[in-house]
A protein has these predicted regions:
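The feature captures the conserved acid-bearing segment of alpha/beta-hydrolase catalytic domains
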Residues: 183-184, 189-203, 215-252
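Alpha/beta-hydrolase
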Residues: 87, 193, 269-272
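Primarily recognizes the serine-hydrolase "nucleophile elbow" in alpha/beta-hydrolase
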Residues: 141-205
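Catalytic nucleophile-loop/oxyanion-hole region of alpha/beta-hydrolase
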Residues: 95-104, 115-156, 283
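C-terminal catalytic histidine-bearing segment of alpha/beta-hydrolase fold enzymes
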Residues: 247, 251, 258-300
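Alpha/beta-hydrolase active-site loop signature
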Residues: 91, 119-123, 197, 273
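N-terminal cap/lid segment of alpha/beta-hydrolase-fold proteins
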Residues: 23-79
Length: 300
């Protein structure tokens, strides 16, 4: 299969930043930018299983009424310790908490709690991406409210996300929390890896075949449009073998945040694609892991 960038035909109009529809669809389809994606995803699931084998069974807790609204909580024995809340990716339509625990072993060894929520696939909720954002928000609220019960420090919640999970993680900063009883989000630090932060181009791409984008959703769920809210330490990561659109999104979000907030770092990871960069999180000395450790120290 030819995965190279389609050449624009004279008859094709530009859809976004000079890209034709075919070029935009190509840019937002990870199959075109990571030929080894199936193998790497299998490795991520395998390493998650290895990580879980090194740990006590997590608590399986309900944060909502729906059967999918459950989370895995790897409890630390260290009192009043930090908590890492990880939001998995999967183009908003795949992924599980169980298969995204590859970082849990070394975080647990450091004395951290690790929480990984499950939530709906957008294709199972009529393309309603706002529903997923509400689920992740409810999972984070539940985690915050029960920190003391499980020995975690509610003032040290570090939210981490990859791909579409990075998008949802960043949305947690810009969402309204007042209706949930909080004046603002409970996030002490944020790490976003290989995410999307402006939904306009995504809404024009083939992803609109399974996400029911509306102008209101694009406005509400585009963290790029709410950079004034990112006052906590933030780390952004991107692999240099990513899709050009994911690279552009990383660069523009980084630049926008750095103009307003001094506690923002950005990290290029050499030689890795969209999926390989997540796999590196298994190793506690990887750039990905070191960025997370630095965030945890900076958020004190």
């Amino acid at each position: 299969m030819d995965t190279s960038r389609p050449e624009a035909l004279d008859s094709e109009p530009g859809v976004y930043k000079g890209m034709t529809q075919r070029q935009l669809d190509w840019a937002y389809d990870q199959a075109n930018h990571a030929a080894n994606r199936v193998q790497v995803l299998e490795q991520i699931a395998h390493k998650s299983a290895l990580s879980r084998q090194l740990l006590p069974e997590p608590l399986r807790l309900s944060y909502g009424r729906e059967p999918i609204e459950m989370l895995d909580w790897y409890v630390s024995e260290k009192a009043h310790s930090p908590l890492v809340f990880f939001v998995h990716g999967g183009a908003w339509k795949s992924g599980t908490a169980q298969n995204n625990a590859l970082q849990a072993h070394w975080l647990h060894q450091m004395g951290c709690h690790v929480v990984i929520p499950d939530f709906d696939a957008v294709s199972d909720v009529d393309g309603n991406l706002s529903h997923l954002a509400r689920q992740v928000q409810n999972a984070l609220l539940y985690t915050y409210q029960t920190c003391a019960k499980h020995g975690a420090n509610p003032q040290k919640i570090i939210v981490v996300g990859h791909s579409s999970g990075a998008h949802l993680s960043a949305c947690m900063v810009t969402r309204d929390w007042r209706g949930l009883g909080l004046q603002e989000h409970p996030i002490s630090a944020l790490l976003c890896c290989s995410g999307m932060y402006e939904l306009e181009p995504v809404s024009l791409s083939a992803r609109s075949q399974y996400v029911r984008f509306t102008p209101e959703m694009v406005q509400d769920l585009s963290p790029q449009r709410g950079t004034e809210h990112f006052k906590m330490p933030v780390a952004l990561l991107c692999g240099d073998q990513e899709s050009p659109e994911f690279i552009r999104q990383f660069q523009e979000f980084s630049e926008s945040l750095k103009l307003k907030h001094p506690r923002v770092t950005s990290h290029w990871v050499q030689g890795v694609n969209h999926f390989e960069i997540l796999e590196t999180l298994f190793e506690p000395d990887s750039i990905h892991a070191r960025a997370l450790k630095a965030l945890m120290e900076d958020s004190i």
